[in-house]
């Protein structure tokens, strides 16, 4: 079982002191994060490509085996709405080459707009463009997509149906790939719910799971609870030395 667990993003000062140490400078957030959790979901790639300098810094800051999932650019999902995407898809994937070459690129999350309804020909054509060397997960935000015909298209490409849940919608738990991709958006999760999720994850071959809470540290804390219960231990981290001390 391979569990890659974390949150959507990490650059949140409001996570102090519940997750980040109070005196930790923001430039070391990712370094500390990677000692507690082993994966993160990049949301910034939805609006802009990750440049080489950023990727080099992320690679250097994270522990061995750490994985970055990346949300695909809005040009593909929201502007072109999955149509005529061969060139922008190729450009997006190439923009992540440094992470991939370092062995730190996780799945690409393809999050469709809420007003994009199911179109079997559209999804079949788009999925046909996806190179098999990558992992892809689809988060559909209109329930018309949740049909066997769509699931079959994903299965043929080993693309995962994202099991996303929020107060507005919950995707059906249908497995379409050899890995699972979860996104948790509920405001609260009880200890019993986290225990159940841990058991569910442990029964799978490979899982990517991300909690979302930008304003408070609960999402990161929930991810840590599951990580520790699943046997993912915290790694050593050295806090910055106080000024005037060596």
Show the residue positions of the predicted features:
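Residues lining hydrophobic/aromatic ligand-binding pockets adjacent to catalytic sites
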Residues: 1-246
């Amino acid at each position: 079982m391979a569990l890659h667990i974390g949150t959507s993003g990490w650059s949140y000062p409001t996570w102090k002191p519940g997750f980040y140490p109070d005196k930790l400078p923001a430039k070391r957030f990712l370094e500390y994060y990677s000692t507690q959790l082993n994966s993160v979901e990049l949301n910034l790639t939805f609006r802009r490509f990750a440049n080489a300098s950023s990727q080099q810094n992320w690679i250097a800051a994270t522990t061995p085996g750490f994985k970055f999932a990346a949300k695909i650019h809005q040009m593909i999902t929201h502007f072109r709405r999955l149509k005529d995407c061969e060139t922008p898809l190729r450009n997006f994937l190439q923009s992540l080459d440094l992470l991939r070459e370092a062995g730190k690129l996780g799945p690409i999350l393809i999050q469709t707009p809420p007003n994009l309804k199911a179109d079997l020909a559209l999804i079949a054509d788009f999925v046909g463009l996806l190179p098999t060397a990558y992992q892809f997960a689809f988060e559909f935000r209109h329930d018309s997509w949740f049909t066997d015909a769509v699931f079959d298209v994903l299965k043929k490409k080993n693309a995962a149906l994202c099991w996303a849940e929020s107060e507005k919608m919950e995707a059906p738990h249908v497995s379409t790939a050899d890995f699972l991709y979860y996104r948790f958006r509920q405001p609260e999760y009880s200890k019993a719910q986290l225990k159940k999720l841990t058991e569910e994850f442990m029964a799978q071959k490979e899982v990517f799971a991300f909690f979302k809470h930008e304003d408070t540290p609960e999402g990161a804390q929930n991810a840590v609870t599951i990580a520790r219960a699943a046997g993912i231990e915290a790694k050593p981290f050295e806090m910055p030395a106080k000024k005037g001390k060596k």
